A protein has these predicted regions:
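Charged linear interaction tracts used for macromolecular binding and regulation
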Residues: 76-166, 172
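Extended, charged low-complexity segments
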Residues: 153-215
Length: 215
C-alpha cells in the first residue's frame, strides 16, 4: 500500500436493504435468501486523502451481492454516486477508499468478495440526506434514482425515545471498534439506478458511525 497516501475519514453510515429485520449480515451471517439488494450511504464529516480534504462529502452505493460476505464467498455488482459538489481530486480519492484499493477496512472488505466485484460506474449526483440527531430516522434521496428512508425500531417495551442498539457486532459493516449499531426498519426503498431496479418496504435498515484510516 506504499503507493497510496495516508488517509482518514470519520462520519455516518447507514443502509437500507432487502433483508428482514434484523439484518443477518451484522451478525456475520449470510444474507436472507442468499442475496442482498441495498442502498449504502456514507457521509464524511471530516476526512482527508493525502492533501485532499474530504470534509462534508456524501456518497451512495447501490448494488446487489450474492453469497456469504463474511465467509469470503460473496460476489458483488454495484454502482456509486458521489456528491455533485465534489471536485475532480475528491472524485478520484473517494473511490480509491471505498473500493478498497487504498487499504484500511474497505481494503479488508474487498478481499471478502472472492467471487468477484463488478462496477457499473461512478457518477456525480445531487445527494440529499437526513439523519435525526436522536437517530430516530434517517434517509437519502437522489431524485429519480434512489429513495431510501427508515425509522428506528420501537416497540411496546421500548422506553420513549430509546432505540435498540448493538455493540460488539460480529459483522459490523463499518468494521471493528466501538461502533454502535442502531436498528431501524425501512419506510421506503426504491432504486432505479446503475441498471438496478428494485423496491422494498418494512425491511432492514441500520445506522452505524465509521472511523477509517489507511493505508
Amino acid at each position: 500500500m506504499s503507493d497510496f497516501p495516508s488517509w482518514h475519514i470519520v462520519g455516518d453510515w447507514f443502509d437500507n436493504c432487502s433483508c428482514a429485520v434484523p439484518c443477518p449480515c451484522t451478525f456475520a451471517q449470510a444474507p436472507d435468501n442468499g442475496f442482498c439488494e441495498s442502498v449504502l450511504f456514507w457521509h464524511v464529516r471530516e476526512g482527508y486523502y493525502g492533501d485532499v480534504k474530504l470534509d462534508n462529502l456524501s456518497f451512495v452505493r447501490v448494488g446487489r451481492w450474492e453469497g456469504d460476505l463474511w465467509a469470503r464467498q460473496a460476489t458483488v455488482v454495484a454502482g456509486l454516486y458521489i456528491d455533485d459538489h465534489a471536485d475532480d481530486r475528491q472524485m478520484e480519492a473517494l473511490p480509491m477508499i471505498i473500493g478498497g484499493r487504498a487499504g484500511g477496512f474497505p481494503g479488508w472488505v474487498n478481499e471478502c468478495f472472492a467471487g468477484g466485484r463488478k462496477s457499473r460506474g461512478i457518477e456525480r449526483a445531487q445527494i440529499t440526506y437526513e439523519i435525526a440527531p436522536d437517530l430516530g430516522h434517517w434517509g437519502v434521496d437522489i431524485i429519480g434514482k434512489v429513495k431510501a428512508w427508515a425509522k428506528a425500531i420501537g416497540g411496546p417495551t421500548s422506553p420513549p425515545g430509546k432505540y435498540p442498539q448493538l455493540i460488539n457486532a460480529p459483522g459490523s459493516e463499518t468494521g471493528p471498534g466501538p461502533q454502535v449499531v442502531t436498528w431501524g426498519k425501512s419506510t421506503i426503498l426504491s432504486v432505479d439506478a446503475h441498471g438496478f431496479k428494485f423496491e422494498y418496504t418494512l425491511n432492514s435498515a441500520k445506522h452505524i458511525p465509521f472511523d477509517w484510516v489507511g493505508p
